[in-house]
Amino acid sequence: MAATTMKASFPLLMLMGISFLASVCVSSRSDPQNPFIFKSNKFQTLFENENGHIRLLQKFDQRSKIFENLQNYRLLEYKSKPHTIFLPQHTDADYILVVLSGKAILTVLKPDDRNSFNLERGDTIKLPAGTIAYLVNRDDNEELRVLDLAIPVNRPGQLQSFLLSGNQNQQNYLSGFSKNILEASFNTDYEEIEKVLLEEHEKETQHRRSLKDKRQQSQEENVIVKLSRGQIEELSKNAKSTSKKSVSSESEPFNLRSRGPIYSNEFGKFFEITPEKNPQLQDLDIFVNSVEIKEGSLLLPHYNSRAIVIVTVNEGKGDFELVGQRNENQQEQRKEDDEEEEQGEEEINKQVQNYKAKLSSGDVFVIPAGHPVAVKASSNLDLLGFGINAENNQRNFLAGDEDNVISQIQRPVKELAFPGSAQEVDRILENQKQSHFADAQPQQRERGSRETRDRLSSV
């Protein structure tokens, strides 16, 4: 029985590396039935005004049971226009913040200190839960786009923001304290505290209402606010730039491209910062990577041994294919009282399934541990990935000249595992001269097409 299973599985993985999964699977599922893809419309808008927006991706475990271990991970997107600021707030979640595009000033507050950083594309920093921070788009022309991986510390999957400025939907959290507590805390009359720090909730005079209307007009909903050039210059003072040489700081930003790519050739580049390289990522057990795939190129089939990878399409278009088992997206629980039916369902689920989807900017896809995946770029494709369970993760490639785990199988086992001889298997494995990235158009097909065109032209 075990030998039969081996013979069934190895050829499928083998073919996957050769033919981009086209003939691997018993069946195929595209976008609507694919639990591994989250299109950009799956983001919920938490806040939006003329200066920008904040969006939150739906919960991963709402999509499929296979994402139960992602219950406490959420993905947020921030976008703001030039010369704007996300006003101070803190949340009950650890954050890993990555700049997707634009230029920013991030200010991080501590009880006895304040640090400001100039951030650019690829800059990354961990913000511990409860950190008060504010973010400025310092560029004159380009929008700022930031992606956050949030790990809540109170309730799994539930985020709570605490605003110092307050808005129409949520009060300044200082207003939640009683009058006596506020007066004692600030050693100031409540009327002065209310005027300077809080939204007024008592009946206002016409003069006060006029002042408030002007304030709301200039700071609509007090989350993303316009800044003058002079204010940005003031906030830029003493802001430190990210080091391009080191990724080992415990509190300062690091850039994903601060070290050379771990994989690189003419078809693509793969940058990655792991917990071993950066202390900010160690306690969260997360790696962060950035992948560039050139138009018409392929990130070769591979799988992660332990890590679940959440991937966001930053720029470009492409296709991804993931190999799983049939019915991985079903939510129903099996009935325990029918063992034969359960065994039958398990046998069905062992059939290989091809899950594929078109990719465009803003889409998110998830790669569970052990699931082979390949990504093809129809235009230059830029991807950002967060890897959960990063410690001791091994990325195993299933095709390519280097790091190809299938090529490590001993010849006697190849004879047993594959329909062809070991010599034939080796010949196919050696046909691909590239590693990690390759041309998405097989050379044999190109050669055949060229020969066909030549014959037709001669006729």
UniProtKB/Swiss-Prot annotation:
GO terms for cellular component: aleurone grain; vacuole. Residues 337-346 have a biased composition (Acidic residues). Seed storage protein. It comes from Pisum sativum. Residues 1-28 form the signal peptide. This is Vicilin. Its main location: other. Residues 238-251 have a biased composition (Low complexity). Residues 444-459 have a biased composition (Basic and acidic residues). The lineage of its organism: Eukaryota, Viridiplantae, Streptophyta, Embryophyta, Tracheophyta.
